[in-house]
Amino acid sequence: MREVMTTTMARNIFYGGSIFFIVIFLGLTLHSAHYIVNTSTAALPLTDSVARGKRVWEENACINCHTLYGEGAYFAPELGNVMTRWGVIDQPDDAFSTLKNWIEAMPTKVEGRRQMPRFHLTDDQIRDLANFLIWAGKANTQGWPPKDSG
């Protein structure tokens, strides 16, 4: 082996290494996409109602107070498992009525308690939000949140 690296040798090492790492990058990207689509997403299909519920979540800035899968503000409870905590994860009609009653009871005006503002959502918006929270509750969160209480 030569003690001096020629321009051709340097070019071949550069191109070979670049191709190697591009192949590794593409392989990991495809593996991640496959994992996300087939393993880590919710067990339910993404319906129009779920998408509208996500839009209600975003338009009313729910994440400014609540967390979803640990992301968001820690002022109010985690909502990724709220339908499980309420025992309505498999009953969309009960989930809707429970969420509607909760939202309509706010603010409670109880001294010393954090208050949720009244958003004046329509029944359709509340139903869509309930479906979104059911969908979120069925995602594979790998044990998050660590406590059932949220």
Predicted regions and their residues:
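Local sequence-structure signature of Cys/Sec-based thiol-disulfide redox active-site neighborhoods
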Residues: 54-60
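Short cysteine clusters
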Residues: 62-65
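Extracytoplasmic electron-transfer domains, predominantly the class I c-type cytochrome c fold
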Residues: 47-48, 55, 69, 73, ...
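Post-cleavage N-terminal segment of exported redox proteins
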Residues: 1-46, 132-150
